[in-house]
Design a protein with these regions (language model features):
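Acidic interaction surfaces
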Residues: 1-136
Length: 136
């Protein structure tokens, strides 16, 4: 059973990696560079890089592949926690269970979600505790 679980985890990780590659081909070189730097810092701090990758893709998908809007949001966003919460509710509805796993497990509405929208990149909270980057 453990081997099966490990295999499923590897398949999911590969799926996420392929999705990230697809996204990265469509974003600016600056964002690509920032993504790699942020991912390396998470890895060095023992964070969950696959959750970071999945969150990166989910946020990108939220903007319906609109690269300009995505870049504007990730580079210039200065909204409040409530603004970000409303954005996800608009997309996924009030039911938290409707959120993708990586968002449902990563977001605590009571904390400042905008901490994720930093680094002129996205989705990295430099606190790296297990609350934000726990396994899904």
């Amino acid at each position: 059973m453990e081997k099966l679980f490990a295999l499923q985890e590897r398949k999911e990780a590969l799926r996420i990696v392929l999705e990230v590659r697809k996204v990265l081909t469509r974003v600016s070189s600056v964002m690509r560079s920032n993504y790699y730097v942020a991912r390396e810092e998470i890895k060095n701090d023992g964070g969950n890089v696959y959750l970071f990758d999945a969150y990166f893709c989910e946020v990108y998908d939220c903007f319906n592949d609109d690269v300009n809007l995505f870049n504007e949001f990730t580079y210039n966003y200065e909204g409040t926690t409530e603004d970000i919460k409303e954005m996800f509710i608009d997309l996924y509805g009030e039911d938290v269970d409707a959120l993708p796993d990586c968002l449902r497990n990563a977001i605590n509405w009571d904390d400042v979600i905008s901490d994720f929208i930093r680094f002129d990149c996205i989705a990295v909270n430099y606190n790296y505790d297990t609350y934000y980057f726990r396994n899904v």
